[in-house]
Amino acid sequence: MINQTYRLVSARQFEVTYKDKVVHSDKVVVRPTHLSICAADQRYYTGSRGKEAMDKKLPMALIHEGIGKVMFDPTGTFKVGTRVVMVPNTPVEEHEVIAENYLRSSRFRSSGYDGFMQDYMFMAPDRLVELPDSINPHVAAFTELITIAVHALSRFERMAHKKRDTFGVWGDGNLGFIMTLLLKKKYPDSKVFIFGKTPYKLDHFSFVDAAYQINDIPEDVRLDHAFECVGGRGSESAIEQIIAHVHPEACVALLGVSEYPVEIETRMVLEKGITLIGSSRSGREDFARTVDFLAQYPEVVDYLETLVGGRFPVRSIEEITNAFEADLTSSWGKTVIEWEI
């Protein structure tokens, strides 16, 4: 069958390519229905990844956050019409210690390999997770982003000490919102504080115990553990503040991605015995846990609907470009594409 793939060929320029795909007996054919634009997609779209990365990875179909509908499954795993979340990480090996998202051999969609902007996806059944009909598809579109927080929390729980009375989350964006929401649900008797720089964004965090602007943090605020969800150049000052406000032997989870080297005051990390936990992306187990979590706690989905920003039905390359341009000017939430092309 002929499959159309919508690839970014240079900054702000998409083209359609046609591939003759053979339906193999071990692949499920999925029609994408709802996709969500990520900051990483925008770095490619705007060309801000730099010439070397752009030359190496383009042309490439963008987007690694999305859901779809099963159109054909020769493996018998899913019924036709089943809604599924698509897992972008594609491991080519298993390791007894290293998780699939940290294996250097793993392939990740929309990062050197074609993402979900295609007419059909041909995926192994273990790269799909069934999605209950009860979950809002516009929220489910950015399940991958939620799995990043779920994965980071699972790593934290394995490594952190048991005193978990106070948590701090730095970053008032999408990931910070999700992280604080998960912490409040996971530790209902603990206090969760959000630290950000934008007042109107902080207003969305109605469920936290306290919200602080980063230039006005009380001196006596102390935390058992913290999560950094800032990224970029701002992650350096965020980590500096975290080190100052956590108790000795705290665990600090680092989730923010920076294109630049970040300085860390290692003297105080050593003096306080702080554990830094790096966390990146996620694997199939995280997707399964996330879908189960959303199905179990529908009130969490209600909160996550706050993150749904622009909704763009897309039927042409021009409308793809319009969605990406609108996302660049959006100050809050996730842009969701209703993939009808």
Swiss-Prot record:
Gene from which the chain derives: tarJ
**Catalytic activity field:** D-ribitol 5-phosphate + NADP(+) = D-ribulose 5-phosphate + NADPH + H(+)
**Any idea of its EC number?**
1.1.1.405
Q: Which GO biological process categories is it annotated with?
A: cell wall organization; poly(ribitol phosphate) teichoic acid biosynthetic process
Supply the source organism for this entry. Bacillus spizizenii (strain ATCC 23059 / NRRL B-14472 / W23) (Bacillus subtilis subsp. spizizenii)
Pathway linked to the protein: Cell wall biogenesis; poly(ribitol phosphate) teichoic acid biosynthesis
Name under which the protein is recorded: Ribulose-5-phosphate reductase
Looking up HAMAP family in the UniProt record yields:
TarJ
Q: What GO molecular function terms would the record report?
A: ribitol-5-phosphate 2-dehydrogenase [(NAD(P)+] activity; zinc ion binding
Which family does the entry's similarity section mention? Belongs to the zinc-containing alcohol dehydrogenase family.
Any keyword Zinc? yes
